[in-house]
Amino acid sequence: MNSLFASTARGLEELLKTELENLGAVECQVVQGGVHFKGDTRLVYQSLMWSRLASRIMLPLGECKVYSDLDLYLGVQAINWTEMFNPGATFAVHFSGLNDTIRNSQYGAMKVKDAIVDAFTRKNLPRPNVDRDAPDIRVNVWLHKETASIALDLSGDGLHLRGYRDRAGIAPIKETLAAAIVMRSGWQPGTPLLDPMCGSGTLLIEAAMLATDRAPGLHRGRWGFSGWAQHDEAIWQEVKAEAQTRARKGLAEYSSHFYGSDSDARVIQRARTNARLAGIGELITFEVKDVAQLTNPLPKGPYGTVLSNPPYGERLDSEPALIALHSLLGRIMKNQFGGWNLSLFSASPDLLSCLQLRADKQYKAKNGPLDCVQKNYHVAESTPDSKPAMVAEDYTNRLRKNLKKFEKWARQEGIECYRLYDADLPEYNVAVDRYADWVVVQEYAPPKTIDAHKARQRLFDIIAATISVLGIAPNKLVLKTRERQKGKNQYQKLGEKGEFLEVTEYNAHLWVNLTDYLDTGLFLDHRIARRMLGQMSKGKDFLNLFSYTGSATVHAGLGGARSTTTVDMSRTYLEWAERNLRLNGLTGRAHRLIQADCLAWLREANEQFDLIFIDPPTFSNSKRMEDAFDVQRDHLALMKDLKRLLRAGGTIMFSNNKRGFRMDLDGLAKLGLKAQEITQKTLSQDFARNRQIHNCWLITAA
């Protein structure tokens, strides 16, 4: 009897143990990452040919204690290598693990290689050559603490390489994991199986091979025992011949069918090639089709299983499309696949909740470094009077109501950018802004008292409902998370896409960027204030301080301002402002852009202006500003400097976003100024529900 070890992906050990026992293995013992077992020579070859789950089959050769590199060398040399290698066999060493003595795996591999080669030269035998790429024998050494375990890797290449997939092709899951997913899916061979996001077809091919009794090792060309002196070619040929006979019989007797689809024509072509090379191409129908086009291929029965490994995203900007995808799949399953089973394998379990289905079973597994879950569902048969469940019903109804109200109003006003929803319902704490045919959903970060999983699930529901109500493509929804800035610069950089969208606001054309910054380049709540500036600016010299992207300057310029001066500390936003001006034909010396600390520039400037717009941050302690700024504390000092630049009969429009801001009217009077609050006049319909979003004042000489 041979003592053997089969390695596998984490989470599949018990499944592998059952498989090995069914092959005839005895004394199976599960450990993390694999199974120890025993079997005769035939079982060695049976496990190599038939295991769908094992990553490798190892023949342990011995162990040794390693307190020095000499210990490793002598421990390896104690094995009788000369009776293990066929004459002329090449070899390679795979060394893993480190300890205080062996601190580099390459060094460990070199010491093992030296010990093996020296075992031959000491007996005056030809030394075997190393071949790292395609060796006849692979020696595996695993060092754990002070113990080195030495084994012969009888697999050669990993057993997931079945021989049907082009090695250059990208596979999100290995074939061994795919086989486990099939086994755990609840699918019964003989019933239909469908993968609507099949990629290169791995799940379907593994299922078809399982169903037709086709050994996973049947198409492999190389093995790790070809240079092994104890290899029994006669028994191997018997095992191989039996596998070929069973495969022919299984294919001839199988009557059910497999269906695969994907939106990418190139991967579908690869899937067809892979299925043909696996010998089961005639059983699988592959189509180029998006999930949105998915239909039941057998509406009159029999019932089957939908099995898939849908895409998942680690980036925030990919989530809306994935949420929409899962939500859509859930609706299609309920509408078209009543009575079927569904099994999905995912690294993003939160996305699976978008299906709006209750899982019957779930399994955990590792896909490389990723923690994954597989959930199995049974889709209830729909009845004529059953109504589809609505996602986030209260939110959906409110958004639909707001859309009906604001869409018509925005068209009449001549604006393309407006707020559709602003935390109208406390449990759906987001803002939804429309920018032409794009939508930005800003999630207000939930308090720490709210369960993070529940908050994330609610956000997923919001996104799915928003896409559905507005009828937009998922890739035209941008998701952002907004937190209190705590004194940080509000113009935080989020990305580097550099994609700008041209939008219309009354008679102005403006550039917005929906993805790269927390804000988009256009403060929607100041829309009416900008229009007022345009109406007030004819023939006047206009100053815009803390100008951001210069949208107020554009309105003033279009309103007939004699000159405009735009000041901001950020070169990025000044360049953006210049693009906005150029888009509206506002170029030349009459339109100046100045990069400067606005407060420092204000103290030193000696020019005169008829109309000044200033919208400072509530608080700023930017390293590039000379002093920290607090709008409540410092607004009077600001007005003192502004008065010096204000021409007789001129007007300052002052706005800020501080909630509860109190204008120091007595202090203003001492400066010879008076203030008229115009906040209500500057709040448009879409911001009428949030009366504290900003406050706005007209300040003139008393």
Swiss-Prot record:
Catalytic activity line of the entry: guanosine(2445) in 23S rRNA + S-adenosyl-L-methionine = N(2)-methylguanosine(2445) in 23S rRNA + S-adenosyl-L-homocysteine + H(+); guanosine(2069) in 23S rRNA + S-adenosyl-L-methionine = N(2)-methylguanosine(2069) in 23S rRNA + S-adenosyl-L-homocysteine + H(+)
Regulation affecting activity: The N-terminal RlmL activity is enhanced by the C-terminal RlmK activity.
The UniProt record lists the THUMP domain at: 43-154
Q: What is this protein called?
A: Ribosomal RNA large subunit methyltransferase K/L
Per the record, the domain of life is Bacteria
User: Mind listing the GO biological process terms from this record?
Assistant: rRNA base methylation; rRNA methylation
EC number(s) on record?
Answer: 2.1.1.173, 2.1.1.264
Cell compartments where the protein resides: Cytoplasm
**Native source organism of the sequence:** Escherichia coli (strain K12)
Keyword Ubl conjugation annotated: no
Q: How does it assemble?
A: Monomer.
Question: What phylogenetic lineage does the species belong to?
Answer: Bacteria, Pseudomonadati, Pseudomonadota, Gammaproteobacteria, Enterobacterales
Location of the region described as RlmL in the Swiss-Prot/TrEMBL record: 1-397
InterPro entries in the record, alphabetically? 23SrRNA_methyltr_KL (IPR017244), DNA_methylase_N6_adenine_CS (IPR002052), RlmKL-like_Mtase (IPR000241), RlmKL-like_Mtase_CS (IPR053943), RlmL_1st (IPR054170), SAM-dep_methyl-trfase (IPR019614), SAM-dependent_MTases_sf (IPR029063), THUMP_dom (IPR004114)
Q: Can you tell me which family this protein belongs to?
A: Belongs to the methyltransferase superfamily. RlmKL family.
Q: Quick one: where's region RlmK?
A: 398-702
Please provide the record's free-text comment about the domains of this protein: Consists of a N-terminal RlmL domain and a C-terminal RlmK domain, linked by a highly flexible loop.
MF terms per GO, please? 23S rRNA (guanine(2445)-N(2))-methyltransferase activity; RNA binding; rRNA (guanine-N2-)-methyltransferase activity; rRNA (guanine-N7-)-methyltransferase activity
What job does the chain carry out?
Specifically methylates the guanine in position 2445 (m2G2445) and the guanine in position 2069 (m7G2069) of 23S rRNA. Methylation occurs before assembly of 23S rRNA into 50S subunits.
Q: Which PROSITE patterns match?
A: THUMP, UPF0020
Q: Name one GO cellular component term.
A: cytoplasm
